[in-house]
Amino acid sequence: MSGELNGNDTSAQAAVSAGSVLEGAAFADEGEQHNESMKTLVLGALGVVYGDIGTSPIYAFREALHAAATNGILARSDILGVVSLIFWALTLVVTVKYVLFVLRADNNGEGGILSLMALVRGALKGRPDLILGVGICGAALFFGDAVITPAISVLSAMEGLEIVAPNLTPFVVPATVVILVTLFSVQKLGTGRVAIVFGPIMALWFVALGASGLWHIFDDPTVMAALNPYYAVRFLTVSPAVAFVTVGAVFLAMTGAEALYADLGHFGRKPIVRAWLWIVFPCLLLNYFGQAAFILSHGEAAALPFFQMIPSFALWPMVLLATAATVIASQAVITGAYSVARQAVQLNILPRLEIQHTSEKLHGQIYIPRVNLLLGLAVVILVLGFEKSSNLAAAYGIAVTGNMLVTTVLLYIVMTRIWNWRVSRALPIILGFLVIDMLFFSANIIKVHEGGWASIGIATVLVLIMWTWVRGTRHLFQKTRKAEVPLDLIVEQMAKRPPTIVPGTAVFLTGDPKSAPTALMHSLKHYKVLHENNVILTVVTASKPWVASADRARVSQYNERFMLVTLTFGYMQQPNIPRALGLCRRLGWKFDIMTTSFFLSRRSLKASVHSGMPLWQDKLFILLARTASDATEYFQIPTGRVVEIGTQVNI
């Protein structure tokens, strides 16, 4: 689309006008921000949000052409049909669905599948388990995507070596593994120092995409006719069977679109949309149309068109730039996996995980060792198992299309329950999105035997883990509650017949403030003493990402010995109990960490035949509970102030 850069033809003016209309529609309710700040955010969005979709041209068009070829032969109509499908898919799915609609469905500024789930659960209280199940499936598919993205991205970039130096072909897989192992190994150091260059590198990458595509559009300018949807429709109808398979490959051009919503909280809607409309979208289109024009004039180039259309003098720089871009894309996905894992822990979908902060200034920069290890192992195994990016392509589409399908379903609930749209207004839009999503999903699901099993397998395992944890914690709560004593009764008894009173404050953590904490009961049973001040502490996770400090703590006094404190954190916030309790000073309780002891109960779980869950699920839940991060570390309580009391529970 040369006109979109030089502005010399009517198609360029139409594109600019369309961009203005779309941007106006997207920002109708937002005020202007400072230009310099906006430029910085747009540049940052290029480095984080668009790495995945920005590296798709390396392999997406190639895979679509391979699928469209009949007996290895491509007709002109096939090439125009494929590039037309890519253009309209990017327009309808990314520009219309995500930019105009999904990005508006923020949960107090945050995006992502779990944020959307939490938003919908708050609005649709009648069927919380159904929405939870949908959210779990979406999160599992996201993690599946997080495994495949680094593998296919870096592998596809390294395959450029086959063009630069064919004798290096045997080293493609080993070099990919070395890069990925290095990438995962340095995660614990944090990305703050290097992330500053992500934006400029990706900006250079998009310029290279656009320039190389624009240059080759002049090989056959008639390729611009593919902007007409006629070519896409004709391709779909002339040979439906071939077209159906090709649609699954065309979807590779959109992998990474979900990142627009997932990273909403990092940059805000306006920078993400501007980066897409004015930089990413035009450059992607120029490259795809350039590849199509190059193949129309060089029919033998369908093997690796992205690299084959690069001049020989620029091949090495392009391979290096592509490698850097795919590493950045992988880093963005890894960071996203940490963020989703933290949300899942806070929403009690996963057991507690050790979370390390890698920046003193930016709380969002975190490192989760267990997620990093498992993700890294899975990525390396995929690379060694599939060996070529074309083999991984089948596995890639299922995870992303499934995630997009879940997003569409939840978006309908947001439209009707939160935006208060009439069904007659929301349903036609959602049905349109569902038709497109189902087309892409069904075209990818048939590739199970070609590699799609990997994506489904990863998602299935994660769904089992998350649902087992949710079900197990509920079952454990119900079982222990039956054996617990009401807190009101204990408080009343202690007032009538108080045991020996010792100085200081005791804080008892509990998930059920109506029942006496197990640690309190065992303390009374074994030590037969009661502290001067006893705090029954409950930590609650809100259905919104952030809770202000002013709303963090609620304090209610039972009597002179007992008080109930509830601390509320957003699902994007890391609980810090001592710091939060310090806020209680303004509520009348002068918290002093040096005179306070924290009593925690550590449960030893044993599987039971009559637990209410299958035995295998009992054992899996027990394993997950044993691997959970220590509560002392997770809640950031000083170890010297903690007393742990062990109990055994049969589940």
UniProtKB/Swiss-Prot annotation:
Q: Its function?
A: Transport of potassium into the cell. Likely operates as a K(+):H(+) symporter.
Which residue spans traverse the membrane?
A: 41-61, 82-102, 130-150, 163-183, 194-214, 235-255, 276-296, 309-329, 366-386, 395-415, 426-446, 450-470
Q: What is this protein called?
A: Probable potassium transport system protein Kup
- Does the keyword Repeat feature in the UniProt annotation? no
**What topology does it adopt in the membrane?**
Multi-pass membrane protein
**What start and end residues bound the annotated signal peptide?**
none
Q: What are the record's GO terms for cellular component?
A: plasma membrane
Task: Give the UniProt keywords, A-Z.
Answer: Cell inner membrane, Cell membrane, Ion transport, Membrane, Potassium, Potassium transport, Symport, Transmembrane, Transmembrane helix, Transport
Has keyword Membrane?
yes
Family label: Belongs to the HAK/KUP transporter (TC 2.A.72) family.
State one Pfam family annotation.
Answer: K_trans
Q: Which domain of life is it from?
A: Bacteria
Q: Which organism is it from?
A: Brucella melitensis biotype 1 (strain ATCC 23456 / CCUG 17765 / NCTC 10094 / 16M)
InterPro entries named in the record: K+_transporter, K_trans_C, K_trans_N, Kup
Query: Which reaction is the catalytic activity of this chain?
Result: K(+)(in) + H(+)(in) = K(+)(out) + H(+)(out)
Tell me the compartments it is located in.
Answer: Cell inner membrane
